[in-house]
From Swiss-Prot:
Disulfide bonds: none annotated. Pathway: Protein modification; protein lipoylation via endogenous pathway; protein N(6)-(lipoyl)lysine from octanoyl-[acyl-carrier-protein]: step 2/2. It is found in: Mitochondrion. One of its GO terms (molecular function) is 4 iron, 4 sulfur cluster binding. This is Lipoyl synthase 1, mitochondrial. HAMAP family: Lipoyl_synth (MF_00206). [4Fe-4S] cluster 1 binds at C127, C132, C138, S375.
Amino acid sequence: MFHRHLCKLCSKTPSAATLASPLGKLQEERGEGVAKDLKKDKQHRQIFLQKFRERLDSDTTGKNTLAGFIDLPEGISPTMAAVGPLKRGEEPLPPWLKMKVAKGVSRLPRFNSIRKSMREKRLATVCEEAKCPNIGECWGGDEEEGTATATIMVMGSHCTRGCRFCSVLTSRTPPPLDPDEPQKVANAVAEMGVDYIVMTMVDRDDLNDGGAAHVVRCVNAIKEKNPLLLLEALVGDFHGDLKLVETVALSPLSVYAHNIECVERITPNVRDRRASYRQSLKVLEHVNSFTKGAMLTKSSIMLGLGEKEEEVRQTLRDLRTAGVSAVTLGQYLQPARTRLKVSRYAHPKEFQMWEEEAMAMGFLYCASGPLVRSSYRAGEYYIKSLVKQRGAAATKSNTTTTTTNTASLAAATVTDSATLQGE
């Protein structure tokens, strides 16, 4: 009987005696309110869906379609509603990808310090935006050795490209750049108290220089705060403009990283159409030639997107030919239901095989494993030593050159003096 009074939509009418009572009136008013809210909510949904369809229809790029947001079986219309949970893939997650979350990681001083610093300064990290499985390990770090690190993402949290493997938000008109971001990033890095940091960026095709000048300002601000800090920049292709690539390469970086992401054949289906396999290779090759090999270059490959064994091998060869010194290989994991599905889960032994082959090809460093990511902190131990070795070699070379030049100048002075005396 109570539901009969509560719901206005019920076919039976409450009795006159019930309506006359204060409780009955209250129940009747509540029933009307519920009915109005339901009707209003339904109207809002219809209006939202209609506007969403209109926006998709008006898009001229051909990329932002409703079908592009959902993985649909062949023959199924994107307007049909799917009932029940969507499966991530036919294969269950293998045991080597099932991580045990370390208890109390969120209570680690360094983890909390990094998270607090990022929140206060409203900075984005790829660790969170890309849902990296190693966030606890990287942010928690080693309290004694100071190896904690976070990959800071500059130029906002919206990317102008729509790669089908990435969970970072996409927008054709992202918010304008924050002019104070370089200083905010520098302060955040200084508060972390680490000696190695990774800085990445979203692609900003809406900017004439792709954000190259902003990246340089961030790098300079970080290095001014801590000149001894080793800084790795994981950057985009800057529309393939090699002059912009040079602008970033001239900044005081330690490592220039640009990810090729996957093998050439599947690149058009995996990456945004404005990014290409050959363009990425050209960027990496140009950094190496422009800096005469002084800059350490790094790239990354994902497995589980439909690649074949020989294609992975060829990609490693291409990277090495381009002069890349460090490479990482990891398992692609679907970050959301709207992203590409995993084609297969590569076994840890396969990753071990690729690491051995990469080192045999001449790479100075290779991190290869199911949960390895392009900025995985395990790589920084060895990369730090490589950077320091190159820095020491460059210093020694400069010292030798200076000594040689001084000796030559002294010899020339003696010769000139002898000539003058003879005259």
